[in-house]
Regions:
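A conserved beta-strand element that flanks and buttresses the S-adenosyl-L-methionine
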Residues: 114
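Acyl-donor binding region in acyl/amide transferases
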Residues: 121, 127-130
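Class I (Rossmann-like) S-adenosyl-L-methionine-dependent methyltransferase catalytic domain
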Residues: 8-106, 144-203
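A short glycine-rich, Lys/Arg-flanked "PGG" loop and its adjoining helix->strand segment in the class I
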Residues: 129-141
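Short catalytic micro-motifs in class I SAM-dependent methyltransferases
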Residues: 117-118
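Intrinsic, low-complexity polybasic segments
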Residues: 4-6
Length: 203
């Protein structure tokens, strides 16, 4: 179980590296050789997408202001980047614990999981759904995850000016907040990802 009153962090490189095992799960669904793994890293440049920010992201501020009261106990920042959002929550009284590069134990469960700007850098829809499934598997029975993706189609057509890969993502999940620049989706632990029609009408 996730420790009460703590915010855990997991950096994007740990989430996305095909050779990393998150618990007992291999995100890619297959093993890649070191050469293939390096090619994937070079092709997508996902390790360069974590921005250096002096302020927390807009989704982090919105989540704290609107649903933060649900997030205090057993929270994981899944793909925390440089940790700016985690520090933002820590200043506001959350006990931040866990190294940025620590993989999850297969039995770790969290009341809430935050995943911001991670899914846009995964080229494969199949692998994006594997990441979402992995997040779902680490929720407590009453847990929720909030998945933030960029929604500016003009700048999500593959390559950015900084040489990183970003793709437009439309998830089969309920939307809790949508604005210019990003969308926040909600994933509940009971959702059957193979049958979105069962939960899209219930939320």
């Amino acid at each position: 179980m996730g420790a009460v009153g703590k915010l855990f962090t997991l950096c994007a490189s740990t989430v996305l590296d095909p050779l990393k095992r998150l618990g007992s799960v291999v995100i890619s669904g297959a093993f890649y050789s070191p050469t293939d793994q390096e090619q994937i890293r070079m092709i997508t440049n996902f390790h360069k997408t974590a921005r250096v920010r002096s302020k927390p992201s807009a989704p982090a501020r919105w989540i704290y202001d609107n649903i933060g009261f649900d997030l205090y106990e057993g929270t994981l920042d899944y793909g925390c980047g440089r940790g700016t959002d985690a520090r933002y929550f820590g200043i506001r009284g959350w006990d931040i614990n866990g190294g940025e590069h620590e993989p999850l134990d297969r039995y770790d469960k969290f009341d809430t999981i935050l995943c911001s700007y991670v899914l846009n850098v995964i080229p494969s829809e199949n692998e994006r759904m594997q990441v979402i499934s992995h997040i779902k598997n680490h929720l407590t029975p009453e847990g929720n995850a909030y998945l933030t993706v960029r929604n500016d189609k003009k700048n999500l057509n593959g390559w950015t000016k900084s040489g990183t890969y970003q793709t437009f993502v439309d998830l089969p999940l309920p939307i809790v907040h949508k604005t210019s620049g990003y969308i926040i989706y909600k994933l509940e632990s009971w959702f059957n990802l193979d049958k979105p029609e069962e939960y899209m009408n219930e939320v």
